Amino acid sequence: MAVERTLSIIKPDAVAKNIIGEIYNRFEKAGLKIVAARMVHLSREQAEGFYAVHKERPFFNDLVGFMISGPVMVQVLEGENAIVKNREIMGATNPAEAAAGTLRHDYAETIDANAVHGSDAPETAKQEIEFFFKADELCSR
């Protein structure tokens, strides 16, 4: 099994609910290590840049508006199969379809305000991590 890194974002809805620690606890119980973290209030330009892949999608403007509505917690998770493991912890994008015990089932309200973001593949994980962190800001443990 490969040790990987993945980007995770705790979105404005979950930050506002004051559940960052509960989410971090889930990551750590699953064997993932937090190797970088910061809280940031994204600008419109940052959010548009991060979600540029969705620019032509009908939900793009709503997504950007939501992501700039309050601070987010951005972290890099490291561990065996971190990308898949994080996506399993998150659950389905639509909280109504998310399995019991997943972050989105437990903490998300809607498909838009769905608590967390996670990279979906090694290539996107690398790009997303580099969007938020310099190499010397990642602290392997």
From Swiss-Prot:
GO biological process, alphabetically ordered: CTP biosynthetic process; GTP biosynthetic process; UTP biosynthetic process
Location(s), subcellular: Cytoplasm
Binding of ATP, residues: 11, 59, 87, 93, 104, 114
GO CC terms in record: cytoplasm
Annotated EC: 2.7.4.6
Taxonomic classification: Bacteria, Pseudomonadati, Pseudomonadota, Gammaproteobacteria, Chromatiales
Keyword Phosphoprotein listed: yes
Quaternary structure annotation from Swiss-Prot or TrEMBL: Homotetramer.
SUPFAM superfamilies assigned to the protein according to its UniProt record, in alphabetical order: Nucleoside diphosphate kinase, NDK (SSF54919)
Pfam family, one: NDK
Organism this protein belongs to: Alkalilimnicola ehrlichii (strain ATCC BAA-1101 / DSM 17681 / MLHE-1)
Function (record text): Major role in the synthesis of nucleoside triphosphates other than ATP. The ATP gamma phosphate is transferred to the NDP beta phosphate via a ping-pong mechanism, using a phosphorylated active-site intermediate.
Cofactor: Mg(2+)
Family statement drawn from the similarity comment of this UniProt entry: Belongs to the NDK family.
NCBIfam families linked: PRK00668.1 (NF001908)
Active site per the UniProt annotation: 117 (pros-phosphohistidine intermediate)
Catalytic activity: a 2'-deoxyribonucleoside 5'-diphosphate + ATP = a 2'-deoxyribonucleoside 5'-triphosphate + ADP; a ribonucleoside 5'-diphosphate + ATP = a ribonucleoside 5'-triphosphate + ADP
Coiled coil: none
Protein name in UniProt: Nucleoside diphosphate kinase
The entry's keywords: ATP-binding, Cytoplasm, Kinase, Magnesium, Metal-binding, Nucleotide metabolism, Nucleotide-binding, Phosphoprotein, Transferase
Gene expressing this chain: ndk
